Amino acid sequence: AYYRRYLPYFQRVKQLINSGSIGRVMNVQIRFAVPPSDLDHSRKDQPWRVQANIAGGGYFYDLAPHQIDLIQEMFGPIIEATGYTSNRGGYYQPEDTLSACFQFNGGLPGSGSWCFVAHESAREDSIEITGDKGKLKFSVFTYEPIILQNSQGRQEFNEANPRHVQLPLIQSIVDHLRGENVCNCDSISATPVNWVMDRILGKT
């Protein structure tokens, strides 16, 4: 599921951060909001993603891992996390609205908000990185243009996905098996994501 790490879009985000285009990173914010789907309104045929006995939780369990994995890939492991959860819409049993705050091992603070029962006007898919010399904004699922703002003005970057989005990760694994490179996307690197999510949900 963490193939996004290797996509050109997110590689460009990392390159912009590492190049110092926004200076020293001061804060990370995840914001995600979508309206409920038509199936969410059905009591009889609810999506498996909101059946806790199958998915373990709601849409947060399905979507947030991608976001959390990316920011940990960029800034290191999160060592503290806490969250507040609620079911505001009442369409299904698991939580549908969450707020969280967390801290990376280097002291960098961050926060996140997720709402899966928002009005269409509130729809959002963004991660904003604030630095002392600028800011960077990008999406995780919609691949909106990457926006860089600093003293040089505003720039937008468009990075097209390969036809098969898992291909860059697969290539990295093949290169690893052939001894040509090291693929860091393994179960060990993925485990901290589950820990962060459990902390946000108050399960640990």
Please describe what each predicted stretch is.
Residues 4-84, 88-91:
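Predominantly a Rossmann-like dinucleotide-binding segment in NAD(P)-dependent oxidoreductases
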Residues 5, 117, 192:
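Glycine-/small-residue-rich active-site loops that bind phosphorylated ligands and cofactors
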Residues 9-10, 67-68, 166-171, 194-198:
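A general structural signal for well-ordered alpha-helical segments in protein cores
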Residues 55-61, 155-164:
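A short glycine-threonine-serine/GTX helix/turn-capping micro-motif
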Residues 62, 68-143, 170-181:
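Contiguous beta-strand/loop segments that form the cofactor/metal-binding neighborhood of enzyme cores
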Residues 105, 172-204:
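C-terminal helix-rich "cap/oligomerization" subdomain common to oxidoreductases
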Residues 138, 157-171, 185:
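Active-site loop of classical SDR/Rossmann-like NAD(P)-dependent oxidoreductases
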